Amino acid sequence: MENLNRRDLCIALASLATFAAAAQSQSSEHGLPEVMAVPPPPGSAGDPVLDKQRTFPFSALPVVRTANGETRAVTRGVLPTGEAVELHETTLLPGHMPHPAHKHRHSEFMLIREGTVQFDNNGTPELLGPGGVALAASNGMHGLKNVGETNANYFVIAIGRET
């Protein structure tokens, strides 16, 4: 697999912008989707090999606004050691969930940066605040809800493949 170069990155960002514009055109009466889209699983065909050190300035991350808050895709790809990864940041409005509880084959770490969330751990609610981390293990039912009075901000690191 080829390494990600500047040209590939520009094409990927343009594709992401096109996807975001298409998502916004399929909006609710308020101009926003009702539920945040779950990113495609890590390790999908065509994902780049993440074999170069780099930084991801927050101000450069593309923003997709939704009725529940917003998301910022950071990166996705395959590490040289074979693990598929995807990283995004979510801002969740008070009282909202990004989507209903669900499960999938890949695992996810959720790192809470700001706010108070309730992690649905196979039907058992657990509170997490700033600095807290939740692990959604492979095929475990899980979900998040902002139970605080301010926005909740958290990063999701998805590891693994769906097939």
Map each language-model feature to its residues.
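N-terminal secretory signal peptides and thylakoid transit peptides that target proteins
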Residues: 1-17
